[in-house]
């Protein structure tokens, strides 16, 4: 059984191939036109072969049975005789719109043009297939549309802006067919026409561009009056409404469910002229006002409108006299609701119906310029809307602000003049004979200093302080630090008085001083601008400077005394050219000339300051803490006492006196310092003379050995019982080859047997002991390299006096002895040698072991012996 063929698909392809061919089309349905209008019938061809540009033939038949040639695009003699005249006049013509499309135009259609129109195309195809013609029916109706204005000729309306107006258009039709009318109002102004409002054939309203808002607000309306009148109503006329108004009416008919316009007529209804609203403004031409006063400008309005219009008034300010608003500043605005919008210090008021006043308070020079008044008139519209009916700008009003500067004089005097250094100085700068200094003017001061010169050289003034208009005080470089420290005080005592006070006047402050009083004027933004400066005459601050003189005389009231007695010394002070002096006293002591124990050494013992506060300075004798007293006998006399004097107290004693001068409050300034004549304490005695020396059996030791040093005290002169002698012994070392370093305390032993050891940074230790009455042994155990150097001892002898008190003698020092610490070479190299030999032996044995193992196991090869063949020699005689 065979496979069936796909018959449906094959039949479809076959029918598509057969049906495909040329297609000629004209609009489907019936085309309706009115007598006198233009008829346009389009025709196009598709799916054809041959050239791209196709030709068309048009034929007409009134009944649809026999067609008469009407027009052709390619054959001149194609039209019938009755149509050739209309073709020549252009009433009938063909207009090609594309290579495959053409339009038939028949102007001024007549009833005889009603019938059937056929469009055909000559064949250019290889095979004839498809349709080559298409036909449509045209109906021609009589003109039954009547359009006209409500009155003839068209009226001319003259209106004012804001007034209402109405226009009417009559339109009707008596067509036997069911037709609809569409109406459109247009405004023509020269070559430009605008659509205002239209009523479509479907009964819908369409406002034109720019009229949407007015239509929705009800300002522009379109309604019918009766059966044939259409009324355009404008509630408020605008200047843009001026022009010629036309009523355009079109008639529509429905054919096979679609609407088509069959004719359109237009008629001139009216010409509307909008008269502009007269608006004039009057402002003063020029105004002069004093700075600080109020500026009052009026803007008077004149208009021919008597209806309900509301003005909007705006004032502008600018620096140039033109009327352009460029680079202008708006000052105030009164809107149509009578709400005022203004900048600070500006007010806008409504005086009467047609007068508006601008008030600028507290004017300044910045207000000089030109003022413009801009007025706009607003008329109410439909549905609470407003529209502008007029606007005008006034001529510029020139305003000049004059300044009447304040008048005053400045007088400077010195209320306090210094007689000495550190005395206060006070200057007062007063403002007198003031005129025109009101609340809008502030007076501030600046202080200046100028150094006096003996010659005629000009010296620049130095600013001390300046006060700005906001009362801010700024210091100059000369006075900044001293003002911050409170030495310079600038103040305003009264409204007209400024003061400058120097708490402590120095010689550098001598010179000329003057003040400058500045007038500041307040601006509208609450800022202050300087307007005037007035200088005072200078005041010279000077006093004759003489050197301060301070003389101190010391005396010893009691005669010569012995050790253990009380020493007393008084110091009398006298001064000149020092203001209200107070004295501080320092007692000093120096060793007498020839004392080698501590030459040129000055020791401070006790002091008393200018407030009578006593202080022990370098008095270190703990056993005699209360042994010295310094007291004030009179304002210029002081007494020093030292109880239980020692032989070691011998020396030259002086009073060092410093004079202090008050500089204000509790502060004092050092005025002068002087040293009194010396008072000597010299104990004439035949007592023993002590000497000290250092001895060592070994001056060179090996590191680690014991260093033994003896401090030996010898006594010359009087023989003393050992129980009447005691010694303070201290050992010092200078660890250098010379004595160029500071000595280091090793150990000390006081007369009571208490040992004190100094701090050291290495391991060796020291010990100090008394070997005999006059010998003291210092031992350095386990000496180090750092222990080399110069060693010496310091001895302070103590001797018991016949009264039983101990007297300290002068401290004595031994000559230094140099100790050398050597290094033990054998001990130093013993351990490194043993370690080196041991390491070498171990490394050698290890190398031998490695070599043996390598040769025995790793590098051994089997050697084969080569055998040689031994053959016996045969006798040559053998056969």
Curated annotation (Swiss-Prot):
Domain Ig-like C2-type: 22-129, 149-268, 276-389, 406-527, 544-662, 688-813
Cytoplasmic side: 854-879
Coiled coil: none
Cited Pfam families: V-set
Residues bearing glycans: 44, 300, 383, 413, 525, 600, 618, 691
In-chain residues carrying the UniProt-annotated modification Phosphothreonine: 271
Residue numbers covered by motif Cell attachment site: 89-91, 703-705
Superkingdom, natural source: Eukaryota
Range of residues in the leader sequence: 1-21
Membrane disposition: Single-pass type I membrane protein
InterPro entries: Ig-like_dom, Ig-like_dom_sf, Ig-like_fold, Ig_sub, Ig_V-set, IgSF_V-set/TM_domain
Extracellular topological intervals: 22-832
Gene Ontology annotations of biological process type: lipid droplet organization; myoblast fusion involved in skeletal muscle regeneration; negative regulation of translation
Residues spanning the membrane: 833-853
Cell compartment(s), UniProt: Endoplasmic reticulum membrane; Golgi apparatus, trans-Golgi network membrane
GO cellular component: endoplasmic reticulum membrane; Golgi apparatus; membrane
Chain ranges for the short sequence motif Endoplasmic reticulum retention signal as given in the UniProt record: 424-427
Disulfide bonds: 43-119, 169-247, 299-373, 429-515, 571-655, 711-793
Major place of residence: endoplasmic reticulum
Assembly and binders: Interacts with CD9 and CD81. Part of a complex composed of CD9, CD81 and IGSF8. Also seems to interact with CD63, CD82 and CD151.
Protein name: Prostaglandin F2 receptor negative regulator
């Amino acid at each position: 059984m065979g496979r069936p063929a796909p018959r449906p698909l094959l039949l479809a392809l076959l029918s598509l191939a057969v049906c495909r061919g040329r297609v000629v089309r004209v609009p489907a349905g019936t085309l309706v036109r009115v007598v006198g209008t233009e008829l346009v019938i389009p025709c196009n061809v598709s799916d054809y072969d041959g050239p791209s540009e196709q030709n068309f033939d048009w034929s007409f038949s009134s009944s649809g049975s026999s067609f008469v040639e009407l027009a052709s695009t390619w054959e001149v003699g194609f039209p019938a005789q009755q149509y050739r005249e209309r073709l020549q006049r252009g009433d009938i013509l063909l207009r090609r719109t594309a290579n495959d499309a053409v339009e038939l135009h028949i102007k001024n259609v007549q009833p005889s043009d009603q019938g059937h129109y056929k469009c055909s195309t000559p064949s250019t195809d290889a095979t004839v297939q498809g349709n080559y013609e298409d036909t449509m029916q045209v109906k021609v109706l009589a003109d039954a549309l009547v359009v006209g204005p409500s009155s003839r000729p068209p009226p001319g309306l003259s209106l004012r802006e804001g007034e209402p107006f109405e226009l009417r258009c009559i339109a009707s039709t008596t067509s036997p067919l069911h037709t609809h009318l569409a109406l459109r109002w247009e405004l023509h102004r020269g070559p430009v026409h605008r659509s205002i409002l239209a009523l479509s054939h479907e009964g819908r309203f369409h406002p034109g561009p720019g009229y949407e808002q007015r239509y929705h607000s009800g300002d522009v309306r379109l309604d019918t009056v009766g059966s044939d009148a259409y009324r355009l109503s404008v509630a408020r006329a605008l200047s843009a409404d001026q022009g010629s108004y036309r009523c355009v009416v079109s008639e529509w008919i429905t054919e096979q469910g679609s609407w088509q316009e069959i004719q359109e007529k237009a008629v001139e209804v009216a010409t509307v002229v909008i008269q502009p609203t007269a608006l004039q403004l009057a402002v003063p031409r020029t105004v002069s006002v004093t700075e600080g006063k109020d500026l009052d400008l009026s803007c008077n309005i004149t208009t021919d409108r008597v209806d309900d219009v509301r003005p909007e008034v705006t004032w502008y300010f600018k620096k140039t006299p033109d009327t352009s608003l460029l680079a202008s500043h708006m000052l105030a605005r009164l809107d149509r609701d009578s709400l005022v919008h203004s900048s600070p210090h500006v007010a806008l008021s409504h005086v009467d119906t047609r007068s508006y006043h601008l008030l600028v308070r507290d004017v300044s020079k910045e207000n000089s310029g030109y003022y413009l008044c801009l007025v706009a008139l607003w008329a109410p519209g439909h549905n609470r809307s407003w529209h502008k009916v007029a606007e005008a700008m006034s001529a510029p009003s020139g305003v000049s602000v004059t300044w009447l500067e304040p008048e005053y004089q400045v007088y400077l005097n010195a209320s306090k003049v210094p007689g000495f250094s550190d005395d206060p100085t006070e200057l007062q700068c007063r403002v007198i004979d003031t005129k025109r200094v009101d609340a809008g003017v502030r007076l501030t001061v600046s202080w200046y200093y100028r150094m006096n010169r003996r010659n005629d050289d000009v010296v620049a003034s130095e600013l001390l302080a300046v006060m700005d208009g906001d009362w801010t005080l700024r210091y100059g470089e000369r006075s900044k630090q001293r003002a911050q420290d409170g030495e310079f005080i600038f103040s305003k005592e009264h409204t007209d008085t400024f003061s400058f006070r120097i708490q402590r006047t120095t010689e550098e402050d001598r010179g000329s001083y003057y003040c400058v009083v500045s007038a500041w004027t307040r601006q509208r933004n609450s800022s202050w601008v300087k307007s005037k400066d007035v200088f005072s005459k200078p005041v010279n601050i000077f006093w004759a400077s003489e050197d301060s003189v301070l003389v101190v005389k010391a005396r010893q009231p009691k005669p010569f005394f012995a050790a253990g007695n009380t020493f007393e010394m008084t110091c009398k002070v006298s001064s000149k050219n020092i203001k209200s002096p107070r004295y501080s006293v320092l007692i000093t002591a120096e060793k007498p000339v020839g004392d080698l124990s501590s030459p040129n050494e000055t020791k401070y013992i006790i002091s008393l300051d200018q407030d009578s506060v006593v202080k022990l300075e370098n008095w270190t004798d703990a056993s005699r803490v209360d042994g010295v007293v310094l007291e004030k006998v009179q304002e210029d006399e002081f007494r020093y006492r030292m109880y239980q004097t020692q032989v070691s107290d011998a020396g030259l004693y002086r009073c060092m006196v410093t004079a202090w001068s008050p500089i204000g409050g509790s502060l004092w300034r050092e005025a002068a310092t002087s040293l009194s004549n010396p008072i000597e304490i010299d104990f004439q005695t035949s007592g023993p003379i002590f000497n000290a020396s250092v001895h060592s059996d070994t001056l060179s030791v090996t590191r680690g050995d014991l260093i033994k040093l003896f401090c030996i005290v010898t006594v010359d002169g009087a023989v003393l019982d050992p129980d009447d002698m005691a010694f303070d012994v201290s050992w010092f070392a200078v660890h250098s080859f010379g004595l160029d370093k500071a000595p280091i305390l090793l150990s000390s032993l006081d007369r009571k047997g208490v040992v004190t050891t100094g701090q050291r940074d290495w391991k060796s230790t020291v010990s100090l002991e008394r070997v005999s009455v006059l010998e003291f042994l210092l031992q350095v155990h386990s000496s180090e390299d750092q222990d080399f150097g110069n060693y010496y001892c310091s001895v302070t002898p103590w001797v018991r006096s016949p009264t039983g008190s101990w007297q300290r003698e002068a401290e004595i020092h031994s000559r230094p002895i140099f100790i050398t610490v050597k290094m033990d070479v054998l001990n130093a190299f013993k351990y490194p040698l043993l370690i080196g030999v041991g390491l070498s032996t171990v490394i050698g044995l290890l190398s031998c072991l490695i070599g043996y193992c390598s040769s025995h196991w790793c590098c051994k090869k089997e050697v084969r012996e080569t055998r040689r063949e031994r053959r016996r020699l045969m006798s040559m005689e053998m056969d």
